[in-house]
Curated annotation (Swiss-Prot):
Lipidation, S-diacylglycerol cysteine type: C27
The organism of origin for this protein: Paenibacillus polymyxa (strain SC2)
Binding-site residues for Ca(2+), renumbered to this chain: D236, D260, D261, D264
Alphabetically ordered keywords of this record: Calcium, Lipoprotein, Lyase, Metal-binding, Palmitate, Repeat, Secreted, Signal
Record entry for activity regulation: Activated in presence of the surfactant polysorbate 20, while inhibited in the presence of polysorbate 40, polysorbate 60, polysorbate 80, Triton X-100 and sodium dodecyl sulfate. Inhibited by the metal chelator ethylenediaminetetraacetic acid (EDTA). Inhibited by iron and cobalt ions.
Gene: pel9A
Protein name: Pectate lyase L
C-alpha cells in the first residue's frame, strides 16, 4: 500500500471512493444498423485444440465478400454475414483491405493468442477493420491462459489496421501487443492482464530495426489494473519500449491503477534507443498498485516514465496530467536527451511531480503543485513559463505562484465519453481570476487545463 494512506486529503483509499469511471460504449464506423436487434449473445470458450481446428477449417471455407460479422457463437462454416456470423479466427484470414470485421457483443473466451499475422495488411486509405458492432461490447477474455511471456491476448503484427471498441482482459502477458505499423487503435480497454495492458514492440526477436513498429496511433483508450503476479514491476498501462520505431502517438489515453507505471518508454542498452514517442492529452493516476491494493516493493509507480539505461531519446509530452501516482508524475528515468514537455500538470505524486535530474530537456508552460519531493528540472525553462514545486512551495522566476485557489477543484472526477475521450469536469481546471491564465508562452495558460 502507499505509505501516504494516512493523509486524509490524499490517501489512496479515500480518493478511490471519490473517483467515478464511466466506461465507454463502442462506436460504429459507418452505417448504423438500427434494424438489427442488439441481442445478448452467449459466450463460448475455445481451447487451443479448438483454435487449431478452427484455423484448419477456416482455410477451406470461403467467406462472404465485403464486411464480415463474428459472434461468440459464430461458426467457422458460416459465411460471416450478420445473420450467419463466423469466428474471429476465420474472419481474420479472409477480410479484404478497406473492409471491416464487426464483432457482436458478448464474451469471447480464449486460451491462446489471437494473432493478426505479419503480412496480413490493409493499405494506406484502405485499412482493415476490427470494430465493435454498434454500441455492443465485445470482450476478448484470455483468463484461461497461464501466466507467461508467450501468452498474449491480441497480437497485431500486420500493418494498416483499425481496432476499435474492444475490451481485452485476463491475458497471461500483454492484453494487446502491437508489432505492426501504421495502425489505429481506438476506444479500447485493456485490464487485469498479467503484463502491460497495451504494448508496442518488435514482432519477432529476428526483426530488424527497420521493422520495428512505427507510426501507430493509440486514441481514446483506457488501460487499468494490469499486474504481473511474479514481481509486480513489469505491468504498465501503456508501453512503447525496448524495440519500437518512430512516429508512435498516444492521444487522449488514460492509465490508472497499474501495478508498475502508467506509461513506460524504456530504452535498453542491448537493443539501443527506441524511436521518439509523442503523448498528448493523456492522464496517468494511481499507478504503483492496482485498485484492490495489489503491489510489491518492486512496483515503481510512475505516471509517465520516459526513458531508461541513460539512452538519449527526444520524446514529446503535451497537455497531459499526472496525479497521485506512487512515485513520480513525469520522470526522465535516466534519459539524458531532449524531452519536450509542454502544458502539462502534475499534482500530489508520491515523490517528485517532475523528475528530470539530467539532460537538455525543454519545459514550456508546465504546472506542478503539492508534490511530496522537490521537482528536478535539468534543461531549459523556456521564458520562465513553468511553475514548479520546490522546497514545499511553488516557484517561478517571474513571481507566478500556484495555490489551491487557482483551481476550480482538486477533487478528482474522471469519466469517459462514448468515444472513449477523457472527461475531467472541473478537476485541475484553472479558476477564473488565476494569474496562471494567459501567462503561458507565447500565449495561453500554464498547465494542461
Amino acid at each position: 500500500m502507499f505509505k501516504r494512506n494516512d493523509r486524509s486529503k490524499n490517501g489512496f483509499n479515500a480518493l478511490r471512493l471519490g473517483v467515478s469511471f464511466v466506461l465507454a460504449s463502442s462506436c460504429l464506423i459507418g452505417t448504423a444498423y438500427a434494424d438489427v436487434p442488439s441481442n445478448n449473445l452467449p459466450s463460448t470458450t475455445l481451447t487451443e485444440e479448438a483454435v487449431s481446428a478452427t484455423d484448419s477449417a477456416a482455410a477451406s471455407t470461403t467467406l462472404a465478400a465485403g464486411d464480415l460479422y463474428v459472434a461468440p457463437n459464430g461458426n467457422v462454416s458460416n459465411p460471416g454475414t450478420i445473420s450467419s456470423p463466423t469466428t474471429l479466427e476465420a474472419a481474420l484470414t479472409q477480410i479484404a483491405p478497406g473492409k471491416t470485421i464487426y464483432l457482436r457483443g458478448g464474451n469471447y473466451a480464449y486460451s491462446s493468442t489471437i494473432t493478426i499475422q505479419r503480412g496480413n495488411n490493409g493499405s494506406n486509405g484502405s485499412l482493415k477493420g476490427l470494430v465493435a458492432y454498434g454500441s455492443e461490447k465485445p470482450v476478448l477474455d484470455f483468463s484461461a491462459q497461464a501466466f507467461g511471456s508467450a501468452n498474449r491476448g491480441l497480437q497485431l503484427n500486420g500493418d494498416f489496421w483499425l481496432v476499435k471498441g474492444l475490451e481485452v482482459k485476463g491475458a497471461g502477458d500483454n492484453g494487446i501487443y502491437i508489432g505492426g505499423s501504421n495502425n489505429r487503435i481506438e476506444n479500447v480497454e485493456t485490464h487485469h492482464n498479467r503484463d502491460t495492458g497495451l504494448q508496442l514492440g518488435r514482432y519477432s526477436p529476428n526483426a530488424s530495426t527497420s521493422e520495428w513498429p512505427a507510426n501507430n496511433l493509440i486514441l481514446n483508450s483506457y488501460s487499468h489494473d494490469n499486474a504481473d503476479p511474479d514481481n509486480g514491476e513489469d505491468a504498465d498501462g501503456f508501453a512503447a519500449k525496448l524495440t519500437v520505431g518512430s512516429g508512435n502517438v498516444f492521444d487522449n489515453c488514460l492509465a490508472a491503477y497499474n501495478v508498475d507505471d502508467g506509461w513506460d518508454l524504456y530504452s535498453k542498452t542491448e537493443t539501443g534507443p527506441i524511436g521518439a514517442v509523442t503523448i498528448l492529452n493523456s492522464v496517468a493516476h494511481h499507478n504503483g498498485q492496482t485498485s484492490d491494493g495489489t503491489s510489491t516493493a518492486n512496483s515503481d509507480g510512475n505516471g509517465f516514465k520516459l526513458g531508461g539505461d541513460k539512452i538519449k531519446v527526444n520524446h514529446i509530452v503535451k497537455n497531459s496530467i499526472a496525479f497521485q501516482n506512487k512515485k513520480h508524475g513525469f520522470t526522465y528515468n535516466s534519459n539524458p536527451g531532449t524531452i519536450t514537455l509542454t502544458n502539462n500538470t502534475s499534482w500530489d505524486n508520491g515523490q517528485s511531480n517532475f523528475a528530470f535530474d539530467k539532460g537538455e530537456h525543454v519545459f514550456i508552460n508546465n504546472l506542478s503543485f503539492e508534490g511530496t519531493a522537490s521537482d528536478k528540472t535539468s534543461g531549459t525553462d523556456q521564458d520562465n513559463s513553468n511553475v514548479w514545486w520546490k522546497n514545499k512551495k511553488t516557484t517561478n522566476a517571474k513571481g507566478l505562484a500556484a495555490s489551491a485557489d487557482d483551481f476550480v477543484s482538486l477533487v478528482p472526477s474522471i469519466t469517459r465519453g462514448a468515444d472513449g475521450s477523457i472527461q475531467l469536469g472541473d478537476f485541475l481546471k484553472l479558476a477564473k481570476g488565476s494569474d496562471l491564465i494567459g501567462s503561458g508562452t507565447p500565449s495561453g495558460n500554464i498547465g494542461a487545463r
